[in-house]
């Protein structure tokens, strides 16, 4: 399955996230949903935050033109919030999954979808 298929089917296609991307551990975009553009600098900031989250804990982070307040940040997951919408990011051994949800979607529902796909990819060696 292609990275784009994971974005279109396993993330956005579930209805639990409205936009999604898969990034490499270097922050470069491998696949993205239409209209969701994560810049290389934003991807690199996110990727480095999995090793040292202090900068994003203090000031939040930006993805695709939206500034998020950091709710959770550890070596596996970074959760951000903007009003009643937010973003779930999860690191696997070779990639970073990004799922954005809007105010109509429960954060836990979005987190469940992104975390489960991450678990699957980790199990597959990715």
Curated annotation (Swiss-Prot):
Gene Ontology BP, a term: actin cytoskeleton organization
UniProt keyword terms in alphabetical order: Actin-binding, Cytoplasm, Cytoskeleton, Methylation
Primary location class: cytoplasm
UniProt region (Actin binding), positions on chain: 2-36
Domain of life: Eukaryota
Modified residues annotated as N6,N6,N6-trimethyllysine in this record: 104
Record-linked InterPro entries: PFN, PFN_euk, PFN_sf, Profilin_CS
Cellular-component GO terms for this entry: actin cytoskeleton; cell cortex
Annotated function: Binds to actin and affects the structure of the cytoskeleton. At high concentrations, profilin prevents the polymerization of actin, whereas it enhances it at low concentrations. By binding to PIP2, it inhibits the formation of IP3 and DG.
Name of the protein this chain belongs to: Profilin-1A
Organism: Acanthamoeba castellanii (Amoeba)
């Amino acid at each position: 399955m292609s990275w784009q298929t994971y974005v279109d089917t396993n993330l956005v296609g579930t209805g639990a996230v409205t936009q999604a991307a898969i990034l490499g551990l270097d922050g470069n975009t491998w696949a993205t949903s239409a209209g969701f553009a994560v810049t290389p600098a934003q991807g690199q900031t996110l990727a480095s935050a999995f090793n040292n989250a202090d900068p994003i804990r203090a000031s939040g982070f930006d993805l695709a033109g939206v500034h998020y307040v950091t709710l959770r940040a550890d070596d596996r997951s970074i959760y951000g919030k903007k009003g009643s919408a937010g973003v779930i990011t999860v690191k696997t051994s070779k990639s970073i999954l990004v799922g954005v949800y809007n105010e109509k979607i429960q954060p836990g529902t979005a987190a469940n979808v992104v975390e489960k796909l991450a678990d699957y990819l980790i199990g597959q060696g990715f």
